[in-house]
Amino acid sequence: MTHNKVVIIGSGPAGHTAAIYLARGELKPVMYEGMLANGIAAGGQLTTTTDVENFPGFPDGINGTTLTENFRAQSLRFGTEIITETVSKLDLSSRPFKYWLEGAEEEEPHTADSVILATGASARRLHITGEDTYWQAGISACAVCDGAVPIYRNKPLAVVGGGDSAAEEAQFLTKYGSKVYVLVRRDKLRASPIMAKRLLANPKVEVLWNTVAEEAQGDGKLLNNLRIKNTNTNEVSDLQVNGLFYAIGHIPATKLVAEQIELDEAGYIKTINGTPRTSIPGFFAAGDVQDKVFRQAITSAGSGCQAALLAMHYLEELEDTD
């Protein structure tokens, strides 16, 4: 059993930013970066992104994996201890907090005075044929992140979804694509009236009602065609597009705390006044695990900074009361 002042669970931009601040504050943070935790490699969703062009400091853009490697190197430089194991159980019912590692659930728990949960969220996927082949090679789950990438410029694109996110992403993509198709499984949008009105009024948008994606096709390197099916007639046809964007929601990685802390209706951790602070003193939630609105690398990093500063303050108060 080991005890640490502060433990970070997760290794995306939120986790590493928190680690950098805490390490520079000489609090000797320990990060559990996970081993395919939540089905994603250490580093989080950025590791599945090829070109990141909207993170400050990289005027020519940077590969997502390279960016996460830079985060990791910077965390290590200032003294963060990074452990490539997955936390499988977390007990927030008493202090110090207790946690167990995957494969060692029956052993004595490790403990920490403060915990920052930065486990992120994963995009919902359709799991259609060809999806894995063309993921980040024509298929994406973030139009804001990837829409401006050269492979999509002046090309026909498609968005899957019928809610506000789909409407917003489709309109965003009209800045770059020659045309944007919106695939809606039903005969009406779930989007709010004002968002639906804007979408339907956009001359570069065509909504394909009662339509689902069946198969992603291409040349083995980039997507160039989508097999679609009409849910009323079962007719299958081809839709020539160079980009397919999913806007069907995200799944926050809250399994560790789902029964211990309040979640919102979408499953995200509820925090206090827009900060990473939660209803449990000393436990903080940073990044996409508590952010269903922005979901950007830069906002996650900012959230990690806030969590670190709040954790520092909490630990100082804890020392004063001892």
Swiss-Prot record:
Keywords: Cytoplasm, Disulfide bond, FAD, Flavoprotein, NADP, Oxidoreductase, Phosphoprotein, Redox-active center
Cofactor: FAD
InterPro entries: FAD/NAD-bd_sf (IPR036188), FAD/NAD-binding_dom (IPR023753), Ferredoxin-NADP_redctase_2 (IPR050097), Pyr_nucl-diS_OxRdtase_2_AS (IPR008255), Thioredox_Rdtase (IPR005982)
Cysteine pairs bridged by disulfides in the record: 142-145
Cofactor binding: number and manner: Binds 1 FAD per subunit.
Major subcellular site: cytoplasm
GO biological process, one term: removal of superoxide radicals
Binding site for FAD: 11-14, 40-41, 45, 54, 87, 145, 288, 295-297
GO terms assigned for molecular function: thioredoxin-disulfide reductase (NADPH) activity
Location in the cell: Cytoplasm
Pfam families xrefs: Pyr_redox_2
Entry EC number(s): 1.8.1.9
Disulfide bond keyword on record: yes
Keyword Disulfide bond: yes
GO cellular component, one term: mitochondrion
NCBIfam families membership: TRX_reduct (TIGR01292)
Protein name: Thioredoxin reductase
Source species of the chain: Schizosaccharomyces pombe (strain 972 / ATCC 24843) (Fission yeast)
Protein encoded by which gene: trr1
